Amino acid sequence: EILHRLVGSEMCIRDSRIGRKNSVLLGVSIYWLGCFICLFSNSYMIFVLGRFIQGFGIGGPRVVSQAICRDLFSGNRLASINSFIMSIFILVPIVAPLLGQGILFFFYWKYIIVFFILFSLITTCFLLLNVEETLQEKKRISFLAIVKHFKEVLSNLTSMIYIACLGLLLGGLLTFINICQPLYFNYFDVGSRFPLYFALIASMLGLSSYLNSRYVGQFGAVKLAKIFSLLLMIWTSINLLYQINYFSFNLAWFSIFIMISFSFFGFIFGNLNALAINPFGHIAGYASSVIGALSTFIALVVSGSASTFFDGTPIVVIFTLSVCSISTFFLLFTQKLFEKK
């Protein structure tokens, strides 16, 4: 994930200089190189190298796509687009395992790599043929200007608050992802049913992201982010206090707790991301990269620290989500005070 973000940052430096579509093509070309290495690998280490290069290449198009959205949209419309994209993106952990199993049922495992190549080829051709270049040549910037814009992002207090909130909530999400498999396998003993539980949880995040894309234009990104951060704080705090007093975990309760928490996330993530990047329409590509890198760094610090305290029970997840939601609520509702200072 760190490499993915660093490559995204580097790609957006090039993106700001060579254009959006050229940057996507460069990143996808590196991804294809990784695919072919995997396809013709004859050892595990070569296969891992190929996967490494795949991640290296795909980091750029991911961030550039966010920049394209910011080039075309702003404000609540941008938040709506981001939420819709997330609702589709969240379907990946639900559909991908089933798709992979289907390919393996009929073909050899290397056909999964063939599918990667064909799918990326189709999507890249669609982008190149149907999406016009959104960064005109006269707006492309030099390396020295990029350094200046980096300082511009860091000095924007409003965006930095939204970035901090994104990082905290993403940290809570990554904490769950890091320990959910041993938790469900060892503590709840779900065995082969784990993918089903994970799919149900992910579907709640995807559904709420889709609903947010429908209603953000009506209520506004700021209002929705604040309302659902408040609800998330109340929900996680109540459950944390209950578990501190009773320390009684069961599968149904924990799954419901996570599903409701993730449904609140769907109304927050897309809006915060749109609010963070909104002031930087003139440097959308690079700003998107910086926002992604900073929020991921915060998230990795949070999830890495929290995961070290994992004791085999769900308490670490509940505690981390509660602390992160309280911190996010505090930052969002005291934002004006920080800005005045």
Name what the model sees in each region.
Residues 30-37, 45-53, 252-258:
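Paired small-residue
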